[in-house]
Amino acid sequence: MEKNKHCFYVVECSDGSYYAGYTNHIEKRIETHNSGKGAKYTRARLPVALKYVEFHEDKRTAMQAEYYFKQLNRKQKEEYMQKGEPYVATKKFSTK
């Protein structure tokens, strides 16, 4: 996993909803979400599973991708993620 790279990511919450965000350390961010210290939205929908990630050269383009994704409806979001390379978890993230 690339560290300190700007990335746009999507997690699937326990209720099936998606949460999109930006980070420069993806593993740490997922652990933060699952520890209940992440975004307010995800705290009520634990655990979360990483579904998609895009690495970008700078913060600006990663945040533009996040903004674009958040404007889409659910069907469009699923199509967006299918067109890219989905993240295949090599590590289980737990709430412990």
UniProtKB/Swiss-Prot annotation:
Family per record: Belongs to the UPF0213 family.
InterPro entries associated with the record: GIY-YIG_endonuc, GIY-YIG_endonuc_sf, UPF0213_domain
PROSITE patterns in alphabetical order: GIY_YIG
SUPFAM superfamilies xref list: GIY-YIG endonuclease (SSF82771)
Top-level division of the source organism's lineage: Bacteria
Name recorded for this polypeptide: UPF0213 protein BCE_0033
Organism: Bacillus cereus (strain ATCC 10987 / NRS 248)
Positions of the GIY-YIG domain: 4-79
Leader sequence residues: none
